[in-house]
């Protein structure tokens, strides 16, 4: 009896609708001579209508792994870029943004590889690819991939494609673009409108080396 009474009082305190569920009974406590009235539930209360609805949106293990990578921030082998081509302040495609992509890839190639993620800002916030997608009226993903391949072709030539693994993935409802860059077995230069540039990853930045620095680095890096 104590259990049902406790249950009744508990539900009453939380304002559950139990008026139709209660019943008044005569209850004789052991050792007492006179019974007393007690309100209890006729049956154990059904919690079903108060259950929290199940979460219908689920996320894959892969998404959590990507989130962990992003939360880890930038480093010697990880770089984030907000966009592939879109200049957030100018609100249009801009060559300086493309050049930033190219120099990061070059630095990873000339060092020990790395991961470039587009659609994430410097504060590890996932922005998605909508700014880049808005540059195209249709076939947005296809045109995005085409734009990336053109960046590779224009700044490097297609010879480095074998050193890149890239794709678009979804992370908690937002799309990001990753480029997994493998280290190169030879020096790779960025062709910046006829000017050859040599980049190396130093800490969390892609550093431009002058001629003397580049020569010394190449000799040391690929001396075997």
Predicted regions mapped to residue ranges:
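Conserved N-terminal catalytic/coupling substructures associated with nucleotide/phosphate chemistry
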Residues: 1-224
């Amino acid at each position: 009896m104590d259990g049902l009474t406790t249950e009744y009082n508990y539900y009453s305190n939380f304002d559950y609708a139990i008026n139709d569920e209660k019943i008044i009974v005569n209850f004789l406590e052991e050792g007492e001579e006179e019974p007393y009235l007690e309100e209890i539930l006729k049956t154990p209360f059904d919690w079903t209508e108060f259950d929290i609805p199940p979460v219908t949106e689920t996320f894959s293990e892969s998404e959590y792994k990507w989130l962990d990578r992003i939360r880890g921030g930038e480093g010697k082998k990880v770089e984030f870029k907000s966009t592939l081509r879109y200049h957030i302040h100018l609100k249009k495609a801009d060559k300086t943004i493309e050049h930033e992509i190219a120099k990061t890839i070059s630095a990873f190639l000339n060092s020990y590889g790395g991961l470039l993620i587009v659609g994430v800002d410097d504060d590890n916030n996932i922005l998605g690819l909508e700014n880049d997608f808005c540059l195209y009226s249709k076939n947005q993903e296809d045109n995005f991939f085409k734009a990336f391949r053109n960046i590779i072709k224009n700044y490097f030539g297609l010879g480095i494609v074998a050193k890149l693994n890239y794709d678009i993935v979804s992370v908690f409802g937002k799309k990001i673009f990753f480029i997994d860059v493998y280290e190169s077995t030879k020096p790779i230069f960025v062709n910046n409108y006829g000017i050859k540039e040599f980049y190396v990853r130093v800490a969390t930045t892609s550093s431009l080396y002058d001629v003397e620095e580049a020569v010394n680095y190449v000799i040391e890096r690929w001396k075997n």
